[in-house]
UniProtKB/Swiss-Prot annotation:
It is found in: Cell inner membrane. One of its GO terms (biological process) is protein transport by the Sec complex. GO terms for molecular function: protein-transporting ATPase activity. Signal peptide: none annotated. GO terms for cellular component: plasma membrane. This is Protein translocase subunit SecF. Its main location: membrane.
């Protein structure tokens, strides 16, 4: 018989469960103390984008930063990977202030191929944030209802806790790193929650099949065997998906980066949590029922 990896030994799974809990606690501390780094779509502000004829040097970037911060102390300057794009992000500015800012900026950026100014007012940003949260909550509720109907109670509870972990772990990483959270981040969260559910279903279905096949065998052994049996399929899916999105992560630019980062991390977290959150909790549950 092929040798199996012991994923769910009592000591191993409990160590990983504790580490996972500690990580989420740390992440939530950052979330409640520092918050998330929301993009302009989720907070009022102005962004001036320039497509440049030639890359900026470090002195020009420093000058732009000083100019922007003379209007707002927390203004940021962001350049594209090829150096020929620049984003100046600042607070919400009235039209006359924007004209003064662009006038000062264009003393540094003399030649450019295109310019775009985006302004989000406070009321619009609040409305966007509320709608994004509502859409996410409704989607999560639908997923949870599906899980509850699809599985028996202990399987469903384990899957729901797993979904919560995937969500909180991803948010924790963005809170700690202060990577930008844009509307595409919400789409990524929903995508990776769907991925995590799918991964759960694959493993849980195999556990149910093996439980019927070996009714007298210890549940932890059955669960561990099921993970080993589905491991190759899971790894192939993870590797091919990550390989497909890696070029977008590297060369996709700042607009796509929050979405791709969330997907990238979520796939890894979702795969990990299927073993050490969903399956581990299920094993603990069954041991308590003995």
């Amino acid at each position: 018989m092929k040798k199996e990896i012991n994923f769910l030994g009592k000591r191993v799974r409990r160590v990983f469960m504790i580490l996972s809990l500690l990580f989420v606690i740390i992440g939530m501390y950052f979330f409640f103390t520092k918050g998330l780094n929301y993009s302009i779509d989720f907070q009022s502000g102005s962004v001036i984008y320039y497509k440049l004829s030639s890359p900026l040097n470090s002195n020009q970037i420093a000058n732009l930063r000083d100019i922007a911060r003379s209007f707002y102390s927390k203004s940021t300057i962001q350049t594209g990977s090829n150096g020929k794009e620049v984003w100046i992000r600042t607070k919400f500015l009235e039209e006359n202030e924007l004209k003064r800012l662009t006038s000062e900026v264009e003393k540094v950026i003399v030649k450019y191929e295109g310019r775009e100014i985006t302004t989000i007012e406070p009321t619009i940003s609040r409305e966007l944030r509320e709608k994004a949260i509502l859409a996410a909550v409704l989607a999560i509720i639908v997923m949870l209802v599906y899980i509850t109907v699809r599985f028996r109670f202990d399987f469903a509870i384990s899957a729901i806790i797993n979904e919560a972990f995937v969500l909180l772990a991803t948010i924790s990483i963005f809170a700690i790193s202060q990577w930008e959270v844009s509307p595409s981040f919400i789409a990524a969260i929903l995508t990776l929650l769907g991925y995590a559910i799918n991964d759960n279903i694959i493993v849980f279905d195999r556990i149910r099949e093996n439980s019927k096949k070996y009714p007298k065998e210890d549940f932890t052994i059955i669960a561990n065997r099921s993970i080993n049996q589905t491991l190759a399929r899971t790894l192939y899916t993870v590797i091919t998906t990550l390989l497909a999105i890696t070029p977008l992560l590297i060369w996709g630019g700042v607009v796509l980066r929050p979405f791709i980062l969330a997907i990238y991390l979520g796939i890894i977290i979702g795969t990990y949590s299927t073993i050490y959150i969903a399956s581990a909790i299920l094993c603990e549950w069954r041991e308590l029922q003995k």
